[in-house]
Amino acid sequence: MSLRNWFSQLDKEHQSSIDYKKYKPIWADIRTSNYCNLQCNMCSQADSSQIQSFVKKNTHMSKYFRQVAAGNNLDINIDIDFSNLKFLKLAGGEPTIDPYCIAFLDKFIKKYDASKVELIITTNATRIKNFFDKYKSKFKSLTVILSIDAVDEVYNLIRFPANWNTVKHNVDQLCTMKEININLNFVIQPYNILVADQWLHFISKFVKDRPKTKIDFLNCINPKHFSIDAMPDSAKQFVTDMLKTSEKNFPNIRKKISELQTIVTNSSYKQDYHAILVDHLHDISKIRNIDYIKTIPEFKYLL
């Protein structure tokens, strides 16, 4: 369970005994709903309404997603005084298109002085223009955390039904807004680590253009079949060799590449995780009518 989920559950259990009007937070981490336009393989029904819909139509696929309670993490109506707020963090779902999130922001701006608040938003960057055109001038500063995970065909697989070319165009447009801080998130899993050299090239160029960019590599541990533990030793050896080459090719992000090497080194092969991973690859290929093993040659190391 994520920290945000844990606090939401705690709220539900103790809501009646807490007088929220006494508190004036300076930091708020808000997730209004699971409304989302993607069905990323490492997410859950609680994270994405698209996954909810997908699982309803393909019930046999539910076993591959992270097993948490379906629905919204936050379904409470609390009267909180945000007058002292300095940092507002928004996540989803996809907050840039979530009508609940937009309604919350509109209400917040109307009631409080948003020019004193730093807005931090995590987004998949699929539909961001209207959101940032509307809100970027309202807040003291804006930090955008881009959930990327990969590029090209592997991006399209992991973050289905998003298209990398469209997202890359949106990110390029976002980068022209120098007043916006941009950070990158990558959830490390077998599908993307096998082509790490491709997205490390993207990161290397990105950091050259925006040196203050923060890069976060989040090691996927749930679902377990999307952890690096699901990779056979031959696949990990391929990745290890590739990362050594990447260190030479992208010296400006050598420390970040070292983090990936540590993730691979610290993993321990689990045959049962591997079997489920391969089953997922075959099942998702069949459902989408895309032979990912042929489309992405590096996936042969997973078989």
Regions found by a protein language model. Give the residues of each.
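Core AdoMet radical
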Residues: 23-35, 46-72, 83-99, 111-130, ...
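Non-transmembrane alpha-helical segments in soluble domains
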Residues: 40, 102-109, 172, 200-204
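Alpha-helix termini
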Residues: 76-79, 108-114, 134-137, 175-177, ...
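Distinct, well-ordered alpha-helical segments
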Residues: 102-106, 129-136, 195-199
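Conserved C-terminal portion of the radical SAM core fold
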Residues: 120, 140-145, 165-302
